[in-house]
Design a protein with these regions (language model features):
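Non-catalytic structural scaffold of enzyme domains
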Residues: 1-122
């Protein structure tokens, strides 16, 4: 029996499902957990302090409950506002969406890329 990695994909809503789809394409062998924090949606309306106070302990509960090998923060706002505190608080590796924008631009055939973001992101 092989040990399948667990990848947790986190977003403030359902927009991260497109990120989940691409991660599944890249790692079809993994076990996936998708978490949408719709109770605090939309993240772009909250201060960085409020997001950190919400997301960091919530992530601790998710790590304890699911034991992921990798966490993908599929929310641009959460990536920009909470990624550094999450990495400082937990040993589990985190991947954000914002760093992925540069390679996406480089791979664009048309060299036109749209980025949707909240005031807290852009």
């Amino acid at each position: 029996m092989t040990n399948r990695p667990t990848i947790l994909v986190f977003d403030s809503g359902l927009g991260g499902l497109s990120v989940l789809r691409e991660v599944v394409r890249a790692r079809p062998d993994a076990h996936y957990v998708y978490v949408a924090d719709d109770a605090f949606f939309p993240y772009g309306h909250h201060s960085q302090e409020a997001l950190i106070a919400r997301v960091v302990p919530l992530m601790g509960e998710l790590i304890a409950g699911h034991r992921p090998d990798l966490i993908v923060i599929a929310c641009n706002t959460a990536s920009v506002q909470t990624l550094a505190p999450l990495r400082a608080a937990y040993a589990t590796p985190f991947v954000g969406t914002v760093p992925a924008i540069k390679p996406a631009c480089a791979q664009s055939r048309t060299k036109r890329v749209s980025v949707l973001g909240t005031k807290a992101t852009v």
